[in-house]
């Protein structure tokens, strides 16, 4: 099989915990591009937070952002696909989190809207050295009810994130998608949003068959994408659930797993 499209998760797959990219991964992505493979990013990050990594990797393709809620071209920023959250249920979810004293961020037009400044904001922004515009709101539920959000993200201790997501799933799971993107982060998006759905949309737009698509990830929010791709790969550091549904588990991020996969599974296959 000649693979034509490679979709890469960022954090834990391409980007290390210190927000660096292994030179071996950078070189392998360049080699894939030189071989004619379209390489893109599929991330929970907003477009503004994904673009610096796309630039560093010389990726000038549509990027899948916000867990698949948005497909936006790099570097122009042109939006090719977008799904926003219904106001009433988004306000309900925000209110639930605030009542439980959990820090929540609403993403509206690439601006982070918050109800109060707390240490969790600094923790979250530490993953975004490029910076982000933050807006303090007196009534965050009212703001999201009136202005459609692309995503909600909450920050909590690892032992709190799981139960909180379960509670949100019971309350709003028939109207919003809940997912875990990090041990400290839970996220909500519009019903139907997933990296897998966005990747299918992008492949269709590009005229690439499902069988020619490769996806690599490590977390819960990569499940649909890895399951949908013609070749779905789980990082060695991936959660067990992802390894269970992937076609293959590759080396961990510490061992430049993406570089290994490109060399042994994509370029060798393309050369055949």
Where are the language model's segments positioned?
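A general structural signal for well-ordered alpha-helical segments in protein cores
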Residues: 47-50, 90, 149, 161, ...
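Hydrophobic packing residues within well-ordered alpha-helices of enzyme cores
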Residues: 25, 50-54, 164, 168, ...
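Conserved acidic, metal-coordinating active-site core of Asp-based
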Residues: 96, 100-216, 220, 225, ...
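Short, structured coil segments at secondary-structure junctions
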Residues: 57-59, 66-67, 75, 171-174, ...
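Asp-based phosphoryl-transfer active-site loop
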Residues: 2-17
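Mg2+-dependent phosphoryl-transfer enzymes with acidic/Ser/Thr/Gly-rich catalytic loops
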Residues: 1-5, 22, 34, 187-272
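Active-site phosphate-binding/coordination module
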Residues: 20-125
């Amino acid at each position: 099989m000649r693979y034509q499209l490679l979709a890469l998760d960022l954090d834990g797959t391409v980007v290390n915990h210190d927000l660096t990219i292994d030179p071996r991964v950078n070189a392998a992505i360049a080699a894939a591009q030189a071989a004619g493979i379209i390489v893109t990013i599929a991330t929970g990050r907003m477009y503004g937070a994904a673009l610096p990594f796309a630039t560093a990797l010389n990726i000038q393709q549509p990027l899948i952002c916000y867990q698949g809620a948005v497909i936006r071209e790099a570097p122009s920023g042109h939006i090719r696909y977008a799904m926003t959250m219904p106001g009433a249920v988004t306000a309900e979810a925000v209110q639930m989190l605030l009542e439980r004293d959990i820090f929540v961020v609403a993403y509206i037009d690439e601006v982070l809207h918050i109800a109060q400044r707390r240490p969790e904001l600094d923790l979250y922004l530490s993953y975004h050295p490029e910076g982000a515009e933050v807006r303090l709101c007196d009534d965050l539920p009212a703001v999201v009810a009136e202005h459609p959000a692309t995503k909600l993200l909450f920050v909590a201790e690892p032992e709190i994130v799981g139960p909180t997501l379960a509670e949100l799933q019971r309350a709003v799971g028939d109207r919003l998608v809940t997912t875990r993107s990090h041990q400290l982060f839970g996220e909500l998006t519009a019903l139907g949003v997933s990296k897998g759905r966005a990747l299918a949309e992008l492949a269709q737009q590009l005229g690439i068959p499902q069988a020619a698509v490769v996806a690599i990830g490590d977390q819960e929010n990569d499940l649909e994408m890895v399951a949908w791709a013609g070749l779905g790969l789980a990082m060695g550091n991936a959660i067990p659930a992802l390894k269970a549904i992937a076609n293959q588990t590759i080396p961990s991020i510490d061992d430049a797993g993406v570089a290994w996969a490109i060399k042994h599974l994509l370029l060798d296959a393309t050369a055949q």
